[in-house]
Amino acid sequence: MKKLLNISYAILICLFCTGTSTAQNAKAEKKAEKTAELKRIVEGKNYVFKANSANPTGNSSVQVSGSSMQAGNLASMMGGGSIALTGTYDLTLSNDTLTAFLPYYGVAYTAPLNPTEGGIKFKTTKFDYKVTEKKKGNIEISFKPLDLQQRAPGDVQRMIMTVSAGGYANLQITLLNRQPISFTGTLEEVKPKPAS
């Protein structure tokens, strides 16, 4: 009887290890598929980053909708410095055209002449584009606008987007005359519109 019990335990342990191994293999295969899909989307240069929240880096005061607020008040009001965005704010790469329509929260060292040009808004076809594979299936995409006429309104020096295999992304923007800002959101493929 004791021998039968030991054999049963050994069989159960083998089954458990095999089941765990199979589950790990399935999980690894699924992650590899997601990574391959993400790589295909990024290399196709036809996608949109949809921003869900903005993360200003200022520590003294932050300009919000025309009124100056202390960063501590903003952080407590907005939940730790992250500002949830409503509406459609995005960065789109489509047909070799880079288009940005993002808000800006933070300290500006020079003010725009037109108060409606306070966000990060531009459209350009002249930019450097570099894709780097990182650990754990993440991909880093670097954008650098080259056209000074296009860069001047938004004063964008460089943008770095880190995208996970699941499509979640973090966009960090370095600006010439303003403090840096980052955004979190998702990366989605832009489907081509059917010809009519």
Located regions from the model:
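Bacterial Sec-dependent N-terminal signal peptides
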Residues: M1-E29
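Sec-dependent signal peptide cleavage junction
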Residues: G19-N59, S68-Q70, S196
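Helix-rich interaction surfaces within compact, conserved domain-sized segments
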Residues: E29-G44, F127-S196
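N-terminal post-signal-peptidase region of extra-cytosolic proteins
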Residues: E33-T35, M69-G87
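Structural motif
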Residues: N46, T97-T99, Y168
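Generic short beta-strand segments
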Residues: K50-T57, P103-Y104, K144-L146
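Surface-exposed, interaction-prone regions used to assemble/regulate multi-protein complexes
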Residues: V62-G72, G87, L113, P194
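Mid-length scaffold segments of soluble, non-membrane domains
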Residues: G80-K135
